[in-house]
Amino acid sequence: MRMEAKTEAGSSRNKEKSKQKLLDAVEKILNTKGFAGLKVNDIARTAGLDKKLIYNYFGGRDGLIDAYIRSQDFWSNVRNPENSLPIKDGGKDFSKTMLLSQFDYVFKNRELQKILLWGLIENRKSLKKLAEDREETGAVLFEGITDPHFGEDAKRYRAVMALLISGIYYLDIYATTNESTFCGLDLKSKEGRLEIEQALTFLVDKTYG
């Protein structure tokens, strides 16, 4: 029994390592060849694994790409704070934390930036599903935390968040793909990014009054 348990544990570890190698291969190809390079044979070759594992572990190329997209997305990895953190201010501090964390996360994650751009130019099921999952996560946070606080003005708060989050996406992508200066602020410098962070905090404070 003990030997069987060790064998099963080893098999599980090998499976997870292989899955991670395939995910890493997707990332490497995205960085070198772009989305057009994501072909089954190329992914398997880059990972140094049999292409059958792509089907065994992910159901195929699309399933692997979907898993990679979810692993990179900020909102797919946000846990519901209602289950772990006491919310006593209508979600004001939580809103600040999420916006500031996202501003930092998107800036540092070039792969997520590519996924965000990909979602704007291609009608792909996995990207549509990702957008739907983001909306579901957002709905849980809005309905459970901020809607009760804002009451009749709940939609106004959601509109403010839509502007701030989309602004974060644009500024972070702009900073890493074009000149880093926007409205006279160097978005790659600590000073410039601090100004944006302070602006986000200021706008949340004003929204909550």
Task: Name each model feature, range by range.
Residues 80-108, 112, 160-161:
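Hydrophobic alpha-helical connector segments
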Residues 21, 29-63, 67-68:
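Helix-turn-helix
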Residues 65-72, 130:
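Alpha-helical DNA-contacting segments of helix-turn-helix folds
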